[in-house]
Amino acid sequence: MTSVPTVSDSKRAFYAAYPRPINPLYRRVVEELLVEIHLLSVNTSFVYDPLFALGVVTAFDSFMSSYRPIEAVGPLFTALTQAVRQNPEQYRHDANAIAEQVRGVGSDTIRQWLTEAEALGNAPELVRSSFQAIAGRSEFKYSRLFAIGLFSLLETAAPDLVQDPEALKTTVTAIAERFHLPSDKLQKDLDLYRSNLEKMEQARITMEEAIQADRRKREQREQEKLAKAAAAEAPAALEASSDNPEPETSETPS
């Protein structure tokens, strides 16, 4: 009988795959995602689908968008997904594929697909199969990452929809009713996700301002050091000049 990996096992695997230092602000994001994906992946009710992949990719990319160096973001995602025994290439591929199938279709169309039983059959393949599977399961394992995937799907289909709080709430409630999802929890998870994005951005700005202030202080100290050195050299140069007066030139009488 194969033992189920623990959260500690997944964390060790992650830090073995990515041993470099991670900024504390972003390390918390990565660890929370790792724990969440781990707990879902070992749950017998969990079933992977492109919508979940979209949620994982969206959450990671959104929270890590300001991470520096930017070249480290890809390896971080790879280490994260592989640590929880998932395939990073599949996640990226499936997330991009389902998003592209709804890009720009508009709020009316996406609402019809996801709230009217007959209309779902007209939806693109990945959207149709993902939501038909949800409807057909006797026990669907809801998660925050599913909620983020749904939000990203709506945002990709109709950016104006997610900018209108009332329209978004009405749509999410209708989708929850259609697929027997926990409406209140779904709405709270989306509100929390958006709130956390704002907090993350504010923290990033504060951190950047602190870095800039520290850089200015270092530059100022360096300038002051150079000024003091120049001031100390000036008297010595003046003294050397007075010790070596230029010889007088005598005029030749005409």
Swiss-Prot record:
Compositional bias of kind Basic and acidic residues: 213-227
Q: Where is the composition biased (Low complexity)?
A: 228-240
Q: Where is the composition biased (Acidic residues)?
A: 245-254
- Listed InterPro entries: Thf1
User: Keyword Lyase: yes or no?
Assistant: no
- Which keywords fit this entry according to its UniProt record? Coiled coil
* Coiled-coil spans in chain: 183-217
Region: Disordered; residue ranges are 213-254
Entry keyword Coiled coil: yes
Q: Name one GO biological process term.
A: photosystem II assembly
GO annotations of cellular component type: plasma membrane-derived thylakoid photosystem II
The family note in this entry says: Belongs to the THF1 family.
Q: Which HAMAP family match?
A: Thf1
Q: Which NCBIfam families match?
A: PS_II_psb29
Q: What does this protein do?
A: May be involved in photosynthetic membrane biogenesis.
* Designated name of the protein: Protein Thf1
What is the species listed in this Swiss-Prot or TrEMBL entry? Synechococcus elongatus (strain ATCC 33912 / PCC 7942 / FACHB-805)
Q: Which gene encodes it?
A: thf1
